[in-house]
Amino acid sequence: MANYTAADVKRLRELTGAGMMDSKNALVEAEGDFDKAVELLRIKGAKDVGKRAERATAEGLVAAKDGALIELNSETDFVAKNAEFQAVAEQIVAAAAAAKATDVDALKAAKLGDTTVEQTIADLSAKIGEKLELRRATYFDGQVETYLHKRAADLPPAVGVLVEYTGDDKSAAHAVALQIAALKAKYLTREDVPEDIVANERRIAEETARAEGKPEQALTKIVEGRVTGFYKDVVLLDQPSVSDNKKSVKALLDEAGVTVTRFARFEVGQA
């Protein structure tokens, strides 16, 4: 005779998100001890999460709050649309802001209610049956502007931008956030670009020009022109503004009296 009731099964399912048979089996194994059954399902969930570790997490969302920006990944857009997944993401980004967590490790260790962010993600992963990954996190402690972009109306934001700046023109800072979202700047200034990357661009530009049969005396000018083009692609302040392509982002910021001190751009599934 079973030493548990249908109400026990229902309660266990509601608490853990486990299926009916898994809940029944846990209660049988626990000999009706409800707390032990919960523990058994947690252990089973942890094992399942481990098995999921090799599966890809190419979906998910970005979230921002009070200077914090996070990317939380799932395996499918079905989970990304899930209200509980989105609610947990909002709790995590709030925890990131409260803890001033500047990286994933710091955020995983941050408190969230009676547990940690890391355990909260593991519990949700076990409940919904997908691998979840806190992929990126950062926090800026200055004056910030944020922008979140949706790829589709029925999906949560997939691109998030955080801009730290000085100055009073919030609209200019917002325009820069839109710029970063659209044109994917990687660096703030030319000085931020690693020297080996610039050297490689110069080498490629020179070899390409030679292969095209350009005259030797023109190579220096051609190479410099192509490196300048590279800077305009990857350096925020060098980029033509999306609002006025006759001016650089730096020129428009100077006019607005705004200085960008740093920025971050997260896009779901992208490096």
From Swiss-Prot:
User: Which keywords does UniProt give here?
Assistant: Cytoplasm, Elongation factor, Protein biosynthesis
Which InterPro entries does the record match to this protein?
EF-Ts_dimer_sf, Transl_elong_EFTs/EF1B, Transl_elong_EFTs/EF1B_dimer, Transl_elong_Ts_CS, UBA-like_sf
Where is it mostly found? Answer: cytoplasm
| Any one Gene Ontology cellular component term annotated for this protein | cytoplasm
Location in the cell reads: Cytoplasm
CDD domains for the chain: UBA_EF-Ts (cd14275)
One GO molecular-function entry: translation elongation factor activity
Q: Where is this region: Involved in Mg(2+) ion dislocation from EF-Tu?
A: 76-79
Homology family: Belongs to the EF-Ts family.
Its biological purpose:
Associates with the EF-Tu.GDP complex and induces the exchange of GDP to GTP. It remains bound to the aminoacyl-tRNA.EF-Tu.GTP complex up to the GTP hydrolysis stage on the ribosome.
The protein in question is named Elongation factor Ts
